[in-house]
Amino acid sequence: MNDNKQFPVWEVSEIAERESWRKEVNRPIYHIHKWWAQRLGSVFRAVLLYLIEDSTENIWDSYYKVHDYNNITVLDPFMGSGTTIGEALKLGAKAVGCDINPISSFLVRQELARVSIDELSEAFNSLEKNVSPDILKCYQTIDDFSGELIPVLYYFWVKIVVTPDGEEIPLFSKYVFAQNAYASKKPKAQIICPECWKVFEGVYNQTNAVCPHCGKTFNPQNGPASKTTVRSTKGKIYKIKDLVPADGSLLKEKMYALLAVNKNGEKHYQSIKKYDVDLFQDICEQVRHSSTFSPSYNVRPGFNTDQARGYNYDTWRDFFNKRQLYCLGKLLDGIQNIKSQKIREQFLCLFSSTLEFNNMFCSYKGEGTGAVRPIFSNHILKPERTPLENSVWGYSCSSGCFSTLYKTRLLKAKQYLDNPFELYIDPKTKKCSKRIASRK
């Protein structure tokens, strides 16, 4: 390494900032699966060039060149998501990576594995034909307007505590459960009535509401739950943690709303009907007889896991409801039947990624953004009081589902392997474009 070289801090920072806005789009190869502390590929490309180049040439001048350092071997003994490995290979170098975490080893092998796009598409189409119909049947409801069966995108749930007096209290912090991410510009919101449990439309910040179904007057901003406590109808305050069942069972959960899409592609919220409850109960019965996906491993003690264990989440199976277990089991069965090991492992990696968005620790981010806030949105494992149940297979307008993650993550990552690009910012217009500047 030539010590007289200068690292192009400002140029790389500008590119890195753009990359960070949509990392899964701008460097899809490293985002087929969740990993913590992921590094930016543009930064690592520049760092590797700085370390490898012996000349005094400005590193930035060679950033967009196609390189062939086949006489160089890069070692990363703590490779994590594989950014160092991937960027080294793009520069034509040899790369060796390892990690103490087996997830890392599996993940990096899958993201760098070259597979036929045609074979990948064929396997996905087979899953869509043979597996998705059974899953999609589990996510449907009766349209309030047409009376027809229509797809459900998301179900809304709330945890319920039982006081020593036997009163059941839903853990709503407020009764506004859905609003736009830019609420000041689009103030329309969805409200659940605490009396009749019907859904109606209101405004995100309104403090006085009258339920059009039962006439109940209430403040949608004031739910019974506040931070670590809950208030009974008689005004008594309890610590939520003190109301966790002593027999080791989980808190009760109630399904209270859903978001469906009609045949015209229009989304609308609905209250829960008898049909929805019966459908869920039917699936619960089927789970008793068949579920390949049953992660019964114990949740081991730890700083974060103890937060879940404190609410009686003792096995990883507890993180999913029965419909999720049933549908994920169907999907896993289909994936395990894929004959090609290489293709099968690609879909197993995608299946694992799908779990992040399909469990009862997810929540609703709202409209105007990706709807599902996944389990690892924060580095904690505290149970979600108002969990969101996603549709496992999903639809074109879904967020965080198997079918959408296949198209937006796995497929994009494989296409990137064939055409690895770098972001380029025009110095005059500041417009961003893509440049092929790497070995395939």
List the predicted regions and their residue ranges.
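Nucleic-acid modification enzymes, centered on SAM-dependent nucleic-acid methyltransferases
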Residues: 1-75, 85, 89-440
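Conserved glycine-centered beta->alpha loop in an early N-terminal alpha/beta scaffold
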Residues: 78
